[in-house]
Amino acid sequence: MELTELLLVVMLLLTARLDPCLPAPPACDPRLLNKMLRDSHVLHSRLSQCPDIYPLSTPVLLPAVDFSLGEWKTQKEQTKAQDVWGAVALLLDGVLAARGQLGPSCLSSLLGQLSGQVRLLLGALQGLLGTQLPPQGRTTTHKDPNAIFLSFQQLLRGKVRFLLLVAGPTLCAKQSQPTTAVPTNTSLFLTLRKLPNRTSGLLETNSSISARTTGSGLLKRLQGFRAKIPGLLNQTSRSLNQTPGHLSRTHGPLNGTHGLLPGLSLTALGAPDIPPGTSDMDALPPNLWPRYSPSPIHPPPGQYTLFSPLPTSPTPQNPLQPPPPDPSATANSTSPLLIAAHPHFQNLSQEE
């Protein structure tokens, strides 16, 4: 008996016993008959490859597989079932009897495989027909081993095939009648139908949570960025407003005025002489001091730079506007900014 056939028998038996919810027995599946027809043909073709085939010493009893179709149609379903059941059971007995007469050989191995196929057919018919009392049908005796394999093929193509095609649908319908008890597969099916809804709800919840989390974080970032925009604009405007004032506060020694008052000198303003090393800002009257708050970034007295760095104070500062020139003073045609930037112009101014 081959391993595949043994596994098929075990599968059929477990299916019929452990799962009572399956309505149709294995014999109702047409693939089973087709498989057995192919296997019987392959097994009979292997018989020609055995070198030691001899007639049996004792003839074996085999069922008569020939029948009349007209007579078969007139019989009842119960009679047909008993006839087929009896023929298969008698064939199994003949195969076992023929194998018992042989020792280990190629023919004995093939007869062992044939007995496995006959048992498989008998088990499938038992699941469909139940246990039947075999009637006293027609029998034949044979010594030729080839007749045993041919009897099985003719039985499958004849009586078994007509029984499954004609009476099979009616017998399978009786086996599939619903019972009052609710099968377990139904409850399992209902449970599985509910699972997609729960899964979709869970996915929707997770998506909404992630959307809310992402939306709130993005909103906070936008609000923070929006709050920073006015401050950046204010700083930019302050920097632009402070630029003229810083340009006008050029720290260059020009007649002691740092370029604030063009063409004026401390003598014309009535200020005392400034000793060397002192700051010119201290010598100016209070009404001429520049209107900006002192910053730690301004250089100490006596040290001058061309352009002072931009202040870092966040408070807005008014641009430095010089007071109008004194009409009594003579206006200098040279710009104090250019004089402070170029020492050559400073020398020319002093010479004048």
Curated annotation (Swiss-Prot):
GO terms for molecular function: cytokine activity; hormone activity; signaling receptor binding. Residues 1-23 form the signal peptide. Keywords: Cytokine, Disulfide bond, Glycoprotein, Hormone, Secreted, Signal. InterPro entries: 4_helix_cytokine-like_core, EPO/TPO_CS, EPO_TPO, Thrombopoietin. Residues 233-259, 292-352 are annotated as: Disordered. Residues 233-245 have a biased composition (Polar residues). Disulfide bonds join 28-172, 50-106. Glycans are attached at residues 185, 197, 206, 234, 255, 332, 347. It is found in: Secreted. One of its GO terms (cellular component) is extracellular region. Residues 311-327 have a biased composition (Pro residues). GO terms for biological process: cell population proliferation; positive regulation of ERK1 and ERK2 cascade; positive regulation of hematopoietic stem cell proliferation; positive regulation of megakaryocyte differentiation; positive regulation of phosphatidylinositol 3-kinase/protein kinase B signal transduction; positive regulation of protein phosphorylation; thrombopoietin-mediated signaling pathway. Two-domain structure with an erythropoietin-like N-terminal and a Ser/Pro/Thr-rich C-terminal. Lineage-specific cytokine affecting the proliferation and maturation of megakaryocytes from their committed progenitor cells. It acts at a late stage of megakaryocyte development. It may be the major physiological regulator of circulating platelets. Belongs to the EPO/TPO family. This is Thrombopoietin.
